[in-house]
Regions:
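Acidic/His- and Gly-rich active-site-bordering loop/insert found
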Residues: 1-104, 109, 113-129
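General structural feature for long, well-ordered alpha-helical segments within catalytic domains
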Residues: 10-17, 30-41, 74, 102, ...
Length: 406
């Protein structure tokens, strides 16, 4: 039977595993229950297992048993992230989160269950593989740089040498119709940086602002000035997104506080714009503070680089998708999206690509459905077997071409 047929036979099993994961989401780098579930799913399969030291990651290596013509035995990496979000679930599904304040609102439970399904599909084809497969079950994608932790601990060399190609996948609860696969060569997702600003003034009575140094008005001016700077100083065809999500000052309406603070997320799509933001923002904010006779502390933190996919590996994935599911289920995005991913760290080290998969519930309008990270984000189980099949087929197909010297 084909990989797709075998995956369809496993649909119920993969869905049950996904529901188990969904009911017990964990956040960050320490996911002991999730790790235990993954290890149970891999139990009895011929994988070499390595557990993370700084995280509860799982790295599983399958040694292919077929002969290979290449001088160097190829290796391919498949990645799934495993962590949830600090969100109170409001979907109402039967398998809703049992953990207060935690939810798999970004679909990582689907990624993990699909890769676990692919582990079985690949193990059944071990003798056909002329190379090795590295499965990367990663904690801490949601702001904890789990990929960076795993790279530092050697996941890219887990097969005994650097992997030749790497593939990741991400489901969406909106954006595209149900079952649609999405690709984009080159810059696919933005870089993500954090901005943390504290404006330092001198407190006083609200009735006598002249006798104080008001950090609130200066902070408000900074927030609006940042948006003006972007529209005046940056090319509209090389977009920059800056959103202030935290703005805090004071505790009483008639008291001028000593400080005000705000935090922002910054998304860029080129290294030139990213580097320019790193210098332009402190310059602007310090200028405003100086004009008001205040001090300002500007902490600009580089977080994740752009997700840049390899053109050849993207074509490989597109061909596999078209062959397995038909060309009508493949969309190539014309522009990047402003979300960010720490799989970008993997793609900065080895050639690879990232595939989107719409899990919008069937019958729901993808243009109005709740987006990832929403407490109402709902993902359709129906894509699980397709995702597992794609993971497995990507490894099988790419190892075959690499072993043939291509």
């Amino acid at each position: 039977m084909s990989i797709a047929s075998d995956a369809n036979e496993m649909q119920g099993e993969i869905a049950r595993f996904r529901h188990e994961l969904h009911q017990e989401p964990e956040i960050g780098l320490d996911l002991p229950r999730t790790q235990e579930k993954v290890l149970k799913a891999l139990d009895g399969l011929p994988y070499e297992i390595t557990l993370g030291e700084s995280t509860t990651s799982v790295t599983a290596v399958l040694r292919g048993g077929a002969a290979h013509a290449s001088a160097r035995k190829p290796a391919v990496l498949l990645r799934a992230d495993m962590d949830g979000l600090p969100v109170q679930e409001r979907t109402g599904v039967e398998f809703s989160s049992k953990i207060d304040g935690a939810m798999h609102a970004c679909g990582h439970d689907l990624h993990t269950s699909m890769l676990a399904g692919a582990a079985t599909l690949l193990a059944e084809r071990r003798d056909q593989l002329a190379g090795d497969v590295v499965l990367m079950f990663q904690p801490g994608e949601e702001g904890f740089d789990g990929a960076g932790h795993m790279i530092r601990e050697g996941v890219l060399d887990a097969a005994g040498r650097r992997v030749d190609a790497a593939y990741g996948m991400h489901v969406f609860s909106s954006l595209e119709p149900y079952g649609q696969f999405c690709t984009k060569p080159g810059v696919m997702m933005s870089a993500s940086d954090g901005l943390f600003v504290t404006v330092l003034g001198a407190g006083g009575h609200g009735s006598a602002p002249h006798a104080a140094k008001d950090p609130v008005t200066a902070a408000a001016e900074m927030v609006t000035a940042l948006q003006v700077m972007i529209t005046r100083q940056f090319n509209m065809f090389d977009p920059v997104v800056l959103t202030v999500g935290v703005l805090q000052a004071g505790t009483k309406r008639n008291v001028i506080p000593e400080s005000a603070r705000f935090e922002a997320t910054i998304r860029t799509f080129s290294e030139a714009s990213r580097e320019r933001m790193m210098t332009a923002i402190p310059q602007l904010l310090k200028g405003i503070a100086s004009a008001h006779g205040l001090e300002v502390d500007v902490d600009y933190r580089g977080e994740y680089p752009m997700t840049v996919t390899d053109e050849d590996e993207t074509h490989t994935a597109e061909n596999v998708i078209s062959d397995m599911f038909g060309g009508s289920r493949l969309s190539r995005w014309a522009t990047p999206i402003s979300g960010s991913e720490d799989f970008s760290r993997v793609l900065a080290e080895v050639p690879g690509t990232f595939v989107g998969l719409s899990a919008v519930p069937r019958g729901v309008d993808h243009t109005t459905s709740a987006f990832n990270h929403s407490p109402y984000a709902t993902f359709d189980d129906g894509v699980l077997s397709d995702g597992a099949a794609l993971y497995a087929e990507l490894a099988v197909s790419r190892i075959a071409t690499l072993a043939a010297g291509n």
